[in-house]
């Protein structure tokens, strides 16, 4: 904002004083603003070319250890078939280092006690037939009754087993027979494939949750509370809960137990043979329940344990191409009578058995992300269990208190596991209504609780957060899941900067303060400024634009009115001459009323404080000169 200033005359020697005037443009005043929260698809396997059959040419006829395969297909020339009693060259001396065989347990049965004299003849015939079929990469399938048992041979005799190799993935690939040496070894508990974290004492328990048969179930491996118990539950020991669509199958699996094969196997043998550079070590080991699935309802959908291939489960061991699938033996005569969509503990099963690796590896540290993921999975299982109990008519289960936030991830995971087991084994009483959202205790008994904000409270716990008055049956205000009585809620509200009363409805914020919309007015005209431009003076008083100009804008020296911007304009134009302000239309000659401007003939020629044009100024000078000469 500019103030008028005096302008000195251009020259003192001129007979007529021409005073130039300057025009100033002032911008309008500023307008402050008003502010009024997978599973990955199954991993695909490439087709595996079946290796050529292996046999022992130095096996003596009548030896023990092999089974009789079916006869080869008929040939066109029967004369080319050699007789079974052909002579073979004498075997060279055996090299002790050529066969790496581990001795079995001293307390188990010997190989000679397990096999009959018929098996000895089968071994020699198998070697002869294998020589005839060396031109074909495939061998005919063995009859169902000639399945080999998982037994250990003596140290000096390698054993040739016959198994079919099937890639456990959809679509099914071509299955071929594979001979592999499986000497007996000391049973070593091995966890499934993944990152190894030794757990020497706790017994792993598998919790399988299945909603539908269209996708694999997820299993979480946790530690049991009884580390000294080692047993395998039978077909009737599995616990099933079926209020909802999910079922929970709890089994404890032994860490070290030699599984004797039965006389007849209910399932088909599947084995993945390690590469030729590695020696198969043991046919026995820890039978994990994570890889188990059941053919009656999930024949085309094998279970992947609820984890991705790139995300190993808790306590797994990383070693490629060292796992084998062995048959899971079912109880004889056990039928499957369960409902569809639920896992069964009886009937034919297929179990993944992981053989120990030959070279030991250092156990890496368990990643924290995996523990957090297992914690979330267990929490979801517990929530689903509680939801299923409520839908079936049972209240929420009573159990241990919630986990404090100061727990480590490992302790919190263990606590959630125990809480889930406790909730599943201890269904709540009929008069249980839930857990109080205020104190965390159970609400038991009629008339002891109330429901508010979609939560359950004790009657004594549902009080105002400020004055602790009981709010049952009383109106209250809910703010961020917290209850307030009406007086305390009003005291928590913002107060108007003008009337100092609490703002119950809409808040208008301006200049960093809160106002009622009807209290935010101009101090001059008292008009509401809600949604209207305004400005503030040096004292902080609020004005509308018109009243601010009327109060603080410069005034014209002729009409005494404030010089304001033209309608529709944002700038103020004024003329400053002789330390006075003029409107553009008020800057005229006082004698003739002619509009003055910057031109030579239309300029301002003041005389004795009067604004005159050039002609009027000359006329006044002549009058004054004549009067002065008369006086003399």
UniProtKB/Swiss-Prot annotation:
Low complexity bias (residue ranges): 41-53, 144-160
Keyword Nucleus on entry: yes
Location of N6-acetyllysine modifications: 109
GO molecular function: metal ion binding
SUPFAM superfamilies named in the record: Glucocorticoid receptor-like (DNA-binding domain)
Glycyl lysine isopeptide (Lys-Gly) (interchain with G-Cter in SUMO1), cross-linked positions: 324
This protein's record includes keyword Phosphoprotein: yes
Annotated region described as Disordered, given as residue ranges: 1-118, 135-249
Record keywords, A-Z: Acetylation, Activator, Cell adhesion, Cell junction, Cytoplasm, Isopeptide bond, LIM domain, Metal-binding, Methylation, Nucleus, Phosphoprotein, Repeat, Ubl conjugation, Zinc
PTM sites of type Omega-N-methylarginine: 246
N-terminal signal peptide: none
PTM annotation (Phosphotyrosine): residues: 241
Localization, UniProt: Nucleus; Cytoplasm; Cell junction
Phosphoserine PTM positions: 117, 152
Bias (Polar residues) ranges: 26-40, 172-182, 206-239
CDD domains noted in UniProt: LIM1_TRIP6
Family: Belongs to the zyxin/ajuba family.
Function: May play a structural role at sites of cell adhesion in maintaining cell shape and motility. In addition to these structural functions, it may also be implicated in signaling events and activation of gene transcription. May be involved in signal transduction from cell adhesion sites to the nucleus allowing successful integration of signals arising from soluble factors and cell-cell adhesion. Also suggested to serve as a scaffold protein upon which distinct protein complexes are assembled in the cytoplasm and in the nucleus.
Assembly behavior: Interacts with PDZ domains of SCRIB, with VASP and with ACTN1/alpha-actinin.
Protein name: Lipoma-preferred partner homolog
């Amino acid at each position: 904002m500019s103030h008028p200033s005096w302008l000195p005359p251009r020259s003192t020697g001129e007979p007529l004083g021409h005073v130039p005037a300057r025009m100033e443009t002032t911008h309008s005043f500023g307008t402050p603003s008003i502010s009024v929260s997978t599973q990955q698809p199954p991993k695909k396997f490439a087709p595996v070319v079946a290796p050529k059959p292996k046999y022992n040419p130095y096996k003596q006829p009548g030896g023990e250890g092999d089974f009789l395969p079916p006869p080869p297909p008929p040939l066109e020339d029967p004369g080319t078939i050699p007789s079974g009693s052909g002579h073979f060259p004498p075997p060279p001396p055996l090299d002790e280092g050529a066969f790496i065989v581990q001795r079995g347990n001293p307390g188990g049965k010997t190989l000679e006690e397990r096999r009959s004299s018929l098996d000895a003849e089968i071994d020699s015939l198998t070697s002869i037939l294998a020589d005839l079929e060396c031109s074909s990469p495939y061998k005919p399938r063995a009859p169902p009754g000639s399945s080999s048992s998982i037994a250990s041979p003596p140290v000096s005799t390698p054993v040739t087993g016959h198994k079919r190799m099937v890639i456990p993935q959809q679509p099914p690939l071509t299955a071929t027979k594979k001979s592999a040496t499986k000497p007996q070894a000391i049973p070593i508990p091995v966890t499934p494939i993944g990152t190894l974290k030794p757990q020497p004492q706790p017994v792993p328990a598998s919790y399988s949750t299945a909603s539908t048969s269209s996708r694999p179930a997820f299993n979480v491996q946790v530690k049991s509370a009884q580390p000294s118990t080692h047993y395998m539950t039978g077909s009737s020991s599995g616990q099933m809960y079926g209020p909802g669509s999910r079922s929970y199958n709890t089994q404890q699996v032994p860490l070290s137990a030699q599984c004797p094969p039965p006389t007849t196997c209910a399932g088909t043998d599947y084995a993945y043979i390690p590469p030729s550079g590695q020696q198969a070590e043991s046919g026995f080991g820890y039978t994990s329940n994570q890889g188990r699935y059941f053919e009656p309802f999930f024949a085309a959908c094998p279970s992947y344990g609820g984890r991705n291939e790139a995300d190993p489960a808790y306590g797994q061991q990383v070693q490629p191409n060292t796992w084998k699938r062995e048959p899971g033996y079912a109880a004889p005569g056990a039928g499957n009578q369960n409902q569809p969509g639920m896992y069964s503990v009886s009937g034919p099963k297929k179990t993944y058995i992981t053989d120990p690796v030959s070279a030991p590896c250092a156990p890496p540290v368990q990643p924290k992300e995996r523990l957090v993921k297992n914690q979330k999975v267990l929490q979801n299982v517990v929530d689903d269990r509680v939801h299923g109990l409520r839908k079936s008519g049972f209240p929420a289960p009573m159990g241990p208190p919630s986990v404090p936030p100061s727990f480590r991830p490992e302790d919190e995971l263990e606590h959630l596991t125990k809480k889930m087991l406790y909730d599943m084994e201890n269904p709540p009483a009929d008069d249980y209504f839930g857990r109080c959202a205020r104190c965390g205790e159970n609400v038991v008994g009629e008339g002891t609780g109330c429901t508010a904000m979609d939560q359950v409270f004790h009657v004594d716990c549902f009080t105002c957060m400020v004055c602790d008055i009981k709010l049952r049956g009383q109106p209250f205000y809910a703010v961020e899941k917290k209850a307030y009585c009406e007086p305390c809620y009003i005291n928590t509200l913002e107060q108007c900067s003008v009337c100092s009363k609490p703002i119950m409805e809409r808040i208008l914020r301006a200049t960093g303060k809160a106002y009622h919309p009807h209290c935010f007015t101009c101090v001059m005209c008292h008009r509401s400024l809600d949604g209207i431009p305004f400005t503030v003076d040096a004292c902080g008083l609020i004005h509308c634009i018109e009243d601010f100009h009327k109060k603080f804008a410069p005034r014209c020296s002729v009409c005494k009115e404030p010089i304001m911007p033209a309608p529709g304009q944002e700038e103020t134009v004024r003329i400053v001459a002789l330390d006075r302000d003029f409107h553009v239309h008020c800057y005229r000659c006082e004698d003739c009323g002619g509009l003055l401007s910057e031109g030579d003939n239309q300029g301002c020629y003041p005389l004795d404080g009067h604004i005159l044009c050039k002609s009027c100024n000359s006329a006044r000078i002549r009058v004054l000169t004549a009067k002065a000469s008369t006086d003399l």
